[in-house]
Each structure stands twice: as C-alpha cells, then as structure tokens.
Amino acid sequence: MKKPLSFTEFSDLIANKPQSYNFGPNSENPYLAFNLNGSDDSLSDWISNSPCPIIGIGEGKLKTKCDLVIKNTKELPLISKNITEHPFTSMVLIQLLRATEKLSMPNSLIVESFAFSTVQKGIEFKKWLPKKNKVKLPQSKSPDLHIISESNNLSIILNRAD
C-alpha cells in the first residue's frame, strides 16, 4: 500500500500532466488515495477520467467525485490489497460505475453486462474462481441488504461476505 497523498500532493501530481498509462493496471499506481481535507473542485474532471480507482479519505469538496470514500487510513490496507490483487477488475468496476451514472437504466444494464462478461473471461476471475467455495464464510442473521432512502439518494449496503 502506498502512502495516501495530501490534497496538495495530489494537485501537484495532476498539475504535471501525467500520462494515463501511469495509473491503473500494469502500472505502479493501480489506485490513487488522497486526503480530501482542503480539496476543491479543480480536479473533478481529472478524477472522472482517470483510469484507476480514486479513493478519498475523510471529508472535503471532492467527496462526491471519488470512486470510494473512506473515513480514515485504517480502512485503506484491505482496499489497497484488493485493488492491487485485482487491478483489471477494479478498473472495469469503476469505469462501469462512472459510465452508468449518466446512462438510462436499459443502457446501464447493457454496459453492466459487457463489464461482467469482460471480467468473467479475464485471468483474475479464472484465478479467483477455484478458491471461492473453499473458504466457509460466517453466516449472519442480519438482513442481506441495508436500504436507506434519504431525499433523492438511495444507499444500498451489502451486508454479506459472500
């Protein structure tokens, strides 16, 4: 796991106009994590077009532009491990989520189908599949989903390890 950047470090990195191949799968930066404190909207477009997952830490103006927001750096190691072990799948997932944000439901389902078929034919999925059923996951009496509806926002939280 790389050390998360401050917002100033993140801004400086982007100001140097790095090539997109320096981020995402097959690069030293399969993801970028930065502290949202002090952030402004100046990097919104870059974040929206980046090839890798963008992880915001804490609170700040760019919170809604990040692919994932965590409360603090304690949550980063597991996320970092998963992205680093599955960089193509991570990239496909964030690109899917970004694309479907602006599409109609029927078109979103088509794009989702393409994304999942791409992942399921990939080497990461083929390596993961034989391991899937070997680990017995704990069962919970809690509901499988937590659904929270507030104003125009709908949050659906998966509550199962499998």
Regions found by a protein language model. Give the residues of each.
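Terminal peptide-recognition signature
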Residues: 93, 156, 160
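Short, proline-centered helix/strand-breaking motifs
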Residues: 53, 161-162
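C-terminal alpha-helix plus adjacent terminal tail
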Residues: 1-152
